[in-house]
Amino acid sequence: QPWVATIFDPANFDGFQRMAAAVERHDTRMIGQIWHVGRQQLWNPIIAPVGVSALPDAYSWSVPHVMTASDIAMIVEAFVTSAETLKRAGFSGVELHGGHGYLISQFMSPWSNIRDDEYGGDVAGRTRFVREIIAGIRAVCGPNFIVGLKMPGDERVKGGIVPAEAVARLRTIALQKVDLDRA
């Protein structure tokens, strides 16, 4: 998308570095937001979106390719690599965008995640994806690199995340030492 500055494009690295230096020069911290839209990918006749389960996106009605274990590992690694690149650019941390039906929230939601493997089922299973991302970022970027999480507190759909589940989910995720949360 031409209006989004992507950290995975090496051509953008210098711009991210200049931005971080300009902000941090004023004794403030620069936090980059990273995300994957999952099944919300804009429709493309050649490339199917990937998703947690074979459930259509509520807006495009496209049915995603269900992610395999190797797809999941590859995307976890992409999140970790993006965080590491932002750290090298001078950012103080990242916020994982798990709101608005993006991939992280697709994993966490009982409405969109009907998997019967280790990434589905109960709260522990549905938070496994984001917990693996956080653990990977901590391992690569260290304990002082800020890791935040934006996630839904109430999806307002039948069978979706409700406030009580959001609290249980946050307790499970907090064991990974998330520095900030925005619901």
Each PLM stretch: what is its role?
Residues Q1-A183:
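Flavin-dependent oxidoreductase catalytic cores
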